[in-house]
Curated annotation (Swiss-Prot):
Phylogenetic lineage: Eukaryota, Metazoa, Chordata, Craniata, Vertebrata
Annotated protein name in UniProt: Cytochrome b
Organism (species): Damaliscus lunatus
Sites where the protein binds a ubiquinone: 201
Role of this protein: Component of the ubiquinol-cytochrome c reductase complex (complex III or cytochrome b-c1 complex) that is part of the mitochondrial respiratory chain. The b-c1 complex mediates electron transfer from ubiquinol to cytochrome c. Contributes to the generation of a proton gradient across the mitochondrial membrane that is then used for ATP synthesis.
Subunit relationships: The cytochrome bc1 complex contains 11 subunits: 3 respiratory subunits (MT-CYB, CYC1 and UQCRFS1), 2 core proteins (UQCRC1 and UQCRC2) and 6 low-molecular weight proteins (UQCRH/QCR6, UQCRB/QCR7, UQCRQ/QCR8, UQCR10/QCR9, UQCR11/QCR10 and a cleavage product of UQCRFS1). This cytochrome bc1 complex then forms a dimer.
Binding-site residues for heme b b562, renumbered to this chain: 83, 182
Annotated gene: MT-CYB
Length: 379
């Protein structure tokens, strides 16, 4: 009998990607985050679709339409909070996924890595535009501050900002276009994720040792389907705990005040997952310099394959590089904390030191550590 999953044109693609895919036998739970990100994306698209059915992208009604969703729509509150906290879960998974890639040298797969960086940028843009939609105080002022950064671009800056705004300030036109973009972007992310997977399946997965696993492969199903199912269960458990017990834990109280262009909130800050980049932006006194540092803080990931000086791929057997990696993690946590603090002493200097440390670690200290480790056996 001919097996349909191996012959049918559509089933064949699914089979080769999720069923008969040869996978390394030793990939740990750090390899679960790819599938978890897929689940997050599907969840965000579904909850977002139902929210869009009741949301109105007009400055006069946006805030009240979100209130209406929470109060009057059947299970609207749970859909809204699953969407808001789903974004946080998405970014937790993203950061862990990227961190895994850095630790185990997954960036050696150039195409997969670069598409991943584009995915990160697209997700950040989508999340930013989504944060503007409820039209609360932090939505409005966050949009104003972040879009205004583009005015630092020489010569075309001001025109560019007004073009994005669709006027001379963040207003109705801005909200409408942000809603349109926020709706379309997740589908672009789906397409990019498929390209990401396509490139990954060209090379096969990396594994914790960083050594070729061609000699020891196992089928993806049932081994990793069951492992991913457990990961999904834990992800949904964590999300529902957040949604049902502390839905506003990661949000900003200011966003429960309708947007008012005449009243600036005391501390304008983005959602927690952007705070590290926001801290880097604020740590540089010059506006253009700050914007460049902000972009470079993410774009620097593209340089990772070029900065890889070690003879080994993974940091599994490289203790000095491991120390550097965990110092980088601590530094990013410090930046996240600083991004949420007011601009005053001692936070300013801590932010500046942490920002310098961030770039120093990636550009200088980590490649140096690798070079030292390469030469250690000679000593």
């Amino acid at each position: 009998m001919i097996n349909i999953r191996k012959t049918h044109p559509l089933m064949k693609i699914i089979n080769n990607a999720f069923i008969d895919l040869p996978a390394p036998s030793n990939i740990s739970s750090w390899w679960n985050f790819g599938s978890l990100l897929g689940i997050c994306l599907i969840l965000q698209i579904l909850t977002g679709l139902f929210l869009a059915m009741h949301y109105t992208s007009d400055t006069m009604t946006a805030f009240s339409s979100v209130t209406h969703i929470c109060r009057d729509v059947n299970y609207g509150w749970i859909i809204r909070y699953m969407h808001a906290n789903g974004a946080s879960m998405f970014f937790i998974c993203l950061f862990l996924h990227v961190g895994r890639g850095l630790y185990y040298g997954s960036y050696i797969f150039l195409e997969t890595w670069n598409v991943g960086v584009v995915l990160l940028f697209a997700t950040m843009a989508t999340a930013f535009m989504g944060y503007v939609l409820p039209w609360g105080q932090m939505s409005f002022w966050g949009a104003t501050v972040i879009t205004n950064l583009l005015s630092a671009i020489p010569y075309i800056g001001t025109n560019l900002v007004e073009w994005i705004w669709g006027g001379f300030s963040v207003d109705k036109a801005t909200l409408t276009r942000f809603f349109a973009f926020h709706f379309i972007f997740p589908f672009i992310i789906v397409a990019l994720a498929m390209v990401h997977l396509l490139f990954l399946h060209e090379t096969g997965s990396n594994n914790p040792t960083g050594i070729s696993s061609d000699a020891d492969k196992i089928p993806f199903h049932p081994y990793y389907t069951i492992k991913d199912a457990l990961g999904a269960l834990l992800l949904i458990l964590a999300l529902m705990l957040l949604v049902l017990f502390a839905p506003d834990l990661l949000g900003d109280p200011d966003n429960y005040t309708p947007a008012n262009p005449l009243n600036t909130p005391p501390h304008i800050k983005p959602e927690w997952y952007f705070l590290f980049a926001y801290a880097i932006l604020r740590s540089i006194p010059n506006e253009l310099g700050g914007v460049l540092a902000l972009v470079l803080s993410i774009l620097i990931l593209v340089l990772m394959p070029l900065l890889h000086t070690s003879k080994q791929r993974s940091t599994m057997f490289r203790p000095i590089s491991q120390c550097m990696f965990w110092i980088l993690v601590a530094d990013l946590l410090t930046l996240t904390w600083i991004g949420g603090q007011p601009v005053e002493h001692p936070y300013i200097i801590i932010g500046q030191l942490a920002s310098i440390m961030y770039f120093l670690l990636i550009l200088v200290l980590m490649p140096m550590a690798s070079t030292i480790e390469n030469n250690l056996p000679k000593w």
